[in-house]
Amino acid sequence: MQTQERYDRIEQLIRDRGWEKAAAQIQKEIDNAGMLCLSENCDNARMWESYADGGRGVCLEFLAWDDAGLTFFGLHSFNITYSDSREYNLLRDPWEQAKTIVLTKSPEWSYENEWRIVLRNRLGQCTVGNILFPPEFLTRLIFGKNVDEVTKVAVRKWIRAGRCRPALYQVQSIGPIFSMTQID
């Protein structure tokens, strides 16, 4: 569907049945997209507590871009905007509206320094589940401070069986000063 057709369709929806139909179209765009959330930093105690099961998880570090300046996610990477303001124009393209919604968070979350990879479902493409990436883009794997040996052995086995060769690190301390050491 061409952009102008979308605008025309949204304008007609607003005229016919109000904003509910326009909001439903925006929600449909969100429902048909896949999203991966990433952070710029690995040394935040709050994030280790919340997202890594109190330090019992791992952190994967990906190369942000290669020598040519390309990310393995291409144009699908977006930096989160932290703002209390969320303005929507229901006459805009539904996909652009959907991106505004999923790429804006309250300022209280700004410590996350979050990026999101948003994959739009086009022509029946899968946007959920396992997404392949070039192995060279996984540069580091960091074991949380409280990861058990069984998990470490399993992760090392998976790495040996695959094509990724990230550097392995172990978190030593999370707070008040973050520290980690390379282990392999």
PLM feature spans:
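Partner-binding and oligomerization surfaces adjacent to conserved cores of proteins
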Residues: 1-184
